[in-house]
Every structure is written in structure tokens, then in C-alpha cells.
Curated annotation (Swiss-Prot):
Its main location: cytoplasm. This is Lysine--tRNA ligase. Homodimer. Binds 3 Mg(2+) ions per subunit. It comes from Proteus mirabilis (strain HI4320).
């Protein structure tokens, strides 16, 4: 049967189901309050399983534990005068045992048996185990709290497609335990990061989401208009310049976890609205941040997943081992062995290498940009195990401090896992004159057609002129981190409501 034929047959069934449920709701309204709000639960399903799964039936009977629980009815088996139903709440699922003789008169036949899957119930009763050993609640009170007018997805062949999971995330969360677990892990990661940062002496702060000058990264911004001020503003592409202003102000260790917005493409690794954690630490350099990054990931994997070994697809990452460190040019030569490292320092030869692997050279690019493009093409996807890439050219690092021994490069690193960038950190540029010159170069690139080049931020230069102490900064993509921790292969699976075209 074709999908079109299936859809044609399903439509009448669904319409009949909707009509039947609306009629039931109408009857509830006629009989009183159809949406009561006076039931209070005192237990969650996961708590009950944790406390009582290990107890025997006899021990539970002796304990005589009574609980009140509420959630969505996911399954039901009616067997004459008694039935079983499965209730789902935020913690998981628990079975209800519903007997006609244990409920007030009329509740079983006139109410419970007429309720539908997807309805939200509240039940009160004694915790016990069935003959098969399943933890259950023997209900002495059972109430309908919310009438669901639409059926559960799996009653009509589940969610239609992957896109529906993202558009109607509520249905995905109702029917997909893996999705629920993904976002529970995400929440644990966020909490663990905050605890780690506080333990390290950092203060959490918030900086503007709307900015008059979008800075802190090379990206195309979203533009909006502030009516009261009558000025165009930009959704931030990064909080970096504001956070460093705070370091100038005397807050030596700050971090922020929040959204960034970049008006760019959508892919399995990119969403225009995404979550970043940025931190800044005075009197430190990029090497200190490399150590901090290793410790952060080691701590998170252990605290959130219970192990420093993370499985992702066919790969296995061991965060308990020291992470690999390579210079950008070492990585190029490692994954393109025919490359002569000295050729990478010659503009003509570097351009020839780039063109030989299909890179289109822009007129505004210097040697540093060419090197970076070669690295991204030949090496980045091979950086599977946790790896730090260091010695990024100054040309592609407009906010990073130049290396003391080689001013062509900066004291910067990027952190890769599974062939994708997870973090970016560097010793901060605190020379106001050097920063102004780099902003001017960015302006020239923007005028030459690079719409991702940075704007000149005069106020930030003024802040630097007041003195930024030696500082190191780090940004980590939270969404990509969650992808790794949950074995998710598209960023849409770890963002509750990813960006999508409006539905028809």
C-alpha cells in the first residue's frame, strides 16, 4: 500500500477519533470541572523504581507505602473487573492496577473505561508487586486531570517523519524515550559545567544579546531594529568583547552560558541559534586553558556518564588519557603526507597545494588564511580522538595574542573530537594598538566582500586602553558537546526546537 493510500485511509479514522474525544470532553464539561487542578502528586515513577524495585513483594506489603502519582496514560489492558494501565511522567513509567471494587462506585465503568490513551491521570494507592514481579500501584483513587483531544502518535503509525519530530517536539518527547534521555543528559551537562566553573572560582555573568556592533567572531549576523532608540541592532554572534570588558573592570574569572546567533547555513553540525559557554581567566595563557579543557571534559564525562570513555557511533573516545596536541602545519602533513612543511610557509606553493585539493582562493586571502583552508580540507575530519590544534595564523585569529617568538602565529588552540571543532581558546590580545590595526584589516576584508569579517569596535579599543591584564579565553559549543555525550549525529537532535521553515 502506498503512503498516499495509507494517508487516505487514516484520515477518516483520525477524524472519527477527534470527534469522539471532543464529545467525551463535552460530556465532562456538562458534568462539572473538565480540567481540575486540585490533585497533588507526591512521587515520581523513577523515584519509586529506585526505592522499591529491589524489595520483595512481601517487604512491600509490610511497608504499606501509599503514594500519589500523575502522568499520561500510555497503555491500558482492560480485563473485566480489573485492568492495568501504564502511566508516564518526567521520570519514566509505572504500572497502575485498577480494580472496580477498590474505586468509588461508577469510577471504573463510567469513567476509567471511557478514558483514552494520552489522557493525563492522577492516581493514589499502595505500592506493590504483581505476580510477575512488576512494581505497580494498587489504585484506590483515580481521576482524569486533562482530556487529550488528539491520539498518541503511535496509534496512527507513529510520527510521520524525522521533520515532525523537530516541528512537534512535544510528540517526540511523549513517544521517544531516547529523545527524553538526550535532553535530560543535556540538562545534567549544563548543571555540571556550572558547578565545575564555580569550583574553579569563576563568576557567571550575562552580557547583551542585542548589540550595536556584532563582535567576538567572524560570522554573518542577524539584524533587527530597536524602535525606541531608532537604530539597527544585531543579535550577538559571540559575547567575547563584552566579557573581556568585564575583565578590564576587575572581574578576573567570568563565564557565560547563553545563545549566539549566526545568519548562516543549517547542517547536521550547524544551527543559526546555538548555545556556547565562554570563559575568561586573568593571569593565564592558552596553555592553562588547554589543561582546564582536559580537566573539564574528564570531569563532565565522569560525573554525567559515569565513565571517561564515551562511545560515539563506531568510535570510542577516552577522556581519561592525555589529549593529543599538534600544530596546524603538523596536522596538515600528518593527513597529507606528500606535503612538504616548508612549502606551507611560501605563498605561491601554499596556494598551489590549496588549488590542487579543490580550494578556490579569494583575492583577499593571505598566507595564514590559505594555510587554515588547507588544514580544514585535509586534516579536520581526521581529528577523531580528542586533539588540540595549536599555532593558528594571526590572519585568522584577529582577537588572539601573537606568539612572542613568531608573530605570524598566535597563542591559540582549537579543540577537536570526532572530526569536528568543539572549542576555541587563546591568550587574549591586550595590546590596544595591535588590536586596532587588526580591526582595520578586518574592515578592509569586509569592504573587499567578506561579509563575515569583523566590525571595528571603538569602545572595545577604549576598554583595552584602560588595561586588560594578561588573560586567556575559551569558547565551547554546548550543542556539539551534547551530541558527543548522547551519541547524536545531527545538532537538531540535541536542540529542543531547532530552526526550521514554517510548516505548510
Amino acid at each position: 500500500m502506498s503512503q498516499q493510500q495509507q494517508g487516505a485511509e487514516q484520515a477518516p479514522d483520525l477524524n472519527n477519533e477527534l470527534q469522539t474525544r471532543r464529545e467525551k470532553l463535552s460530556a465532562l464539561r456538562d458534568n462539572g470541572n473538565a480540567f481540575p487542578n486540585d490533585f497533588r502528586r507526591d512521587a515520581m515513577s523513577d523515584e519509586l523504581h529506585q526505592k522499591y524495585d529491589a524489595m520483595s513483594a512481601e517487604e512491600l506489603d509490610a511497608a504499606n507505602v501509599e503514594v500519589a502519582i500523575a502522568g499520561r496514560m500510555m497503555t491500558r489492558r482492560i480485563m473485566g473487573k480489573a485492568s492495568f494501565a501504564t502511566l508516564q511522567d518526567m521520570g519514566g513509567r509505572i504500572q497502575l492496577y485498577v480494580s472496580r471494587d477498590d474505586l468509588p462506585e461508577g469510577v471504573y465503568n463510567e469513567q476509567f473505561k471511557k478514558w483514552d490513551l494520552g489522557d493525563i491521570l492522577g492516581g493514589r494507592g499502595r505500592v506493590f508487586k504483581t505476580k510477575t514481579g512488576e512494581l505497580s500501584i494498587h489504585c484506590t483513587e483515580l481521576r482524569l486531570l486533562t482530556k487529550a483531544l488528539r491520539p498518541l502518535p503511535d496509534k496512527f503509525h507513529g510520527l510521520a517523519d524525522q521533520e515532525t519530530r523537530y516541528r512537534q517536539r512535544y510528540l517526540d518527547l511523549i513517544s521517544n524515550e531516547n529523545s527524553r534521555n538526550t535532553f535530560k543528559i543535556r540538562s545534567k551537562i549544563m548543571s555540571a559545567i556550572r558547578q565545575f566553573m564555580v569550583n574553579k572560582g569563576f563568576m557567571e555573568v550575562e552580557t547583551p544579546m542585542m548589540q550595536t556592533i556584532p563582535g567576538g567572531a567572524s560570522a554573518r549576523p542577524f539584524i533587527t531594529h530597536h524602535n525606541a532608540l531608532d537604530i539597527d541592532m544585531y543579535l550577538r554572534i559571540a559575547p567575547e568583547l563584552y566579557l573581556k570588558r568585564l575583565v578590564v573592570g576587575g572581574f578576573d574569572r567570568v563565564f557565560e552560558i547563553n545563545r549566539n546567533f549566526r545568519n548562516e547555513g543549517v547542517s547536521p553540525r550547524h544551527n543559526p541559534e546555538f548555545t556556547m559557554m565562554e570563559l575568561y581567566m586573568a593571569y593565564a595563557d592558552y596553555r592553562d586553558l588547554i589543561e582546564l579543557t582536559e580537566e573539564l571534559f574528564r570531569t563532565l564525562t565522569q560525573d554525567v556518564l559515569g565513565s571517561t570513555i564515551v562511545k560515539y557511533g563506531d568510535e570510542e573516545f577516552d577522556f581519561g588519557k592525555p589529549f593529543e596536541k599538534l600544530t596546524m602545519k603538523e596536522a596538515i602533513c600528518k593527513y597529507r603526507p606528500e606535503t612538504n612543511m616548508a612549502d606551507l610557509d611560501d605563498m605561491d606553493k601554499a596556494v598551489a597545494i590549496a588549488q590542487s585539493i579543490g580550494i578556490k582562493i579569494e583575492k583577499s586571502w593571505g598566507l595564514g588564511r590559505v594555510q587554515c583552508e588547507i588544514f580544514e580540507e585535509v586534516a579536520e575530519s581526521h581529528l577523531i580522538q580528542p586533539t588540540f590544534i595549536i599555532e593558528y595564523p594571526a590572519e585568522v585569529s584577529p582577537l588572539a595574542r601573537r606568539n612572542d617568538d613568531n608573530p605570524f602565529i598566535t597563542d591559540r588552540f582549537e579543540f577537536f573530537i570526532g572530526g569536528r571543532e568543539i572549542g576555541n581558546g587563546f591568550s587574549e590580545l591586550n595590546d590596544a594598538q595591535d588590536q586596532a590595526e587588526r580591526f582595520e584589516e578586518q574592515v578592509r576584508q569586509k569592504e573587499a566582500g567578506d561579509d563575515e569579517a569583523m566590525f571595528f569596535d571603538h569602545d572595545y579599543i577604549t576598554a583595552l586602553e584602560h588595561g586588560l591584564p594578561p588573560t586567556a579565553g575559551l569558547g565551547i559549543g554546548i550543542d556539539r558537546m551534547v551530541m558527543l555525550f548522547t551519541n547524536s549525529h545531527t545538532i537538531r537532535d540535541v536542540i529542543l526546537f531547532p530552526a526550521m521553515r514554517p510548516g505548510k
